[in-house]
Amino acid sequence: MRLVSWNCRKGLNSRDKDKKLLELNPDIALIQESYHPKKFKDDIQYEEAIWVGEEKENGLGICVLSLSKDYQLSLLVDQVKYEWIVPISVSGKENFTLIAVWTQRMNGLSYGNVLYAAL
């Protein structure tokens, strides 16, 4: 299983970024600071995706690439307490809990302390 996490600064908004991601051949990609995955579905051809964020151009996308149809994603909670720390159930070839993270300062806490508080 290959998992890639990438803060790609404003999503996969260029063919260069799409190509670089696909060259890594991930089964699952966590894309921080991302456009909504619908915007790049034709370019990376993911099988399914979860996305969190208030803006359509700035969020956290978690995608199963269509090269690997071995995994399914589902949120473990109805409402995420910390917007950028998302617990996900991954099922399929292997079953596990994935905590997708895009750390940001919140309420005066540093990146690390936000993650620590969420966990």
Where do the protein language model's features map onto the residues?
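Short, low-complexity, polar/charged sequence segments that are solvent-exposed and flexible
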Residues: L22-P26, I50, Y82-E83, A117-L119
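N-terminal, active-site-proximal structural segment of metallo-dependent hydrolase catalytic domains
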Residues: M1-I44, W51, K56
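Structured beta-strand-rich core segments of catalytic domains in phosphoester-bond hydrolases
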Residues: S34-M106
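A long, amphipathic alpha-helix that forms part
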Residues: L109-L119
